[in-house]
Amino acid sequence: MPYTVVAKCGEILNGIEQSLRGSRILQLGISYKKDIDDYRESPSVRIYELLQKSGAHVDVCDPWVKEFFVHEHDATYGNAGPGVKTKPLTPELIAQADLVLITTDHSNFPYSEIAAQAKLVFDTRNALGFRKITSNRIFKLPTPVSPLV
């Protein structure tokens, strides 16, 4: 799923004639699931890594995780060096981002403000849809079609 998310980020940005390389991405959430501080085996970490490797400038906001390691195995054995520090969510960070990427749907994110201030939003958790927030600047993952339909 991380590769699909990163590819979709590229498609969304291409829609405004912008490349993923050099774009500013604001990733909201790094933990494994909402409202916890555990990021072990979180696909959000892999998404962060892939975005970085694609040349995007990524800021991460997560009110539950203050610092994370891309390679947790290295952190366990002391080989990781400094971790990636998350930032507090501010209106300035939202406004500076070319794309806001919601990867963990924490309860305390101000979703209405995010949707109003962001240039583009890619909501992988349906956090905005759940709150009935809609806009032509909000993108979601395609809903898979059941083979039984």
Name each region found by the language model:
Residues M1-V149:
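Structural/interface elements that position substrates and couple domains in central-metabolism enzymes
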